[in-house]
Regions:
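Short beta->alpha hinge that forms the Motif I/post-I loop of the SAM-binding pocket
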Residues: 1-6, 46, 71
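Active-site segment flanking the S-adenosylmethionine/decSAM binding pocket
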Residues: 25-67
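C-terminal substrate-binding/active-site "lid" region of AdoMet-derived donor-dependent transferases
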Residues: 56-112
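C-terminal capping/lid region of NAD(P)-dependent oxidoreductase domains
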Residues: 114-116
Length: 121
């Protein structure tokens, strides 16, 4: 994660929930990838560099498992072809929808992210 605020939030969540096997890296450049142990699972916030991110991760671990997060339908629609291209199978897509009430007891929708999973067998 290259956004400092988002990275800080992720690091706070790792500490708060006691998840000690999570490493947040600033980017997927070759320099960053060289500094980390071989991951078995990656959680990616999808962006315009998703294909390059997948390529770099598969170079580090050809049997990688993926979890991809996006709010954008156009990104979601492009993931299946990418998974097919790189031999990533067992694709599952899940959308999480949360609503809460405001002070007037009115429902307020929250962002409804898509989580897409897949793995190279």
């Amino acid at each position: 994660e290259n956004d400092k605020g988002a990275k800080d939030t992720m690091e706070d969540n790792v500490k708060q929930f006691g998840v000690h096997n999570v490493q947040i890296i600033p980017d997927l450049s070759e320099g960053s990838m060289a500094k980390i142990p071989t991951p078995r699972l990656s959680f990616i916030v999808a962006n315009k560099h998703l294909e390059e991110d997948i390529q770099r991760l598969l170079k580090k671990n050809p049997k990688m498992q993926f979890v991809i997060y996006t709010l954008e339908l156009n990104i979601l629609s492009g993931i299946k072809p990418l998974f097919d291209k790189y031999g990533i199978s067992n694709m599952e897509v899940l959308q999480i929808n949360v609503a809460k009430t405001n002070k007037d007891s009115m429902f307020v929708n929250q962002p409804a992210p898509w989580l897409i999973t897949g793995e190279v067998l």
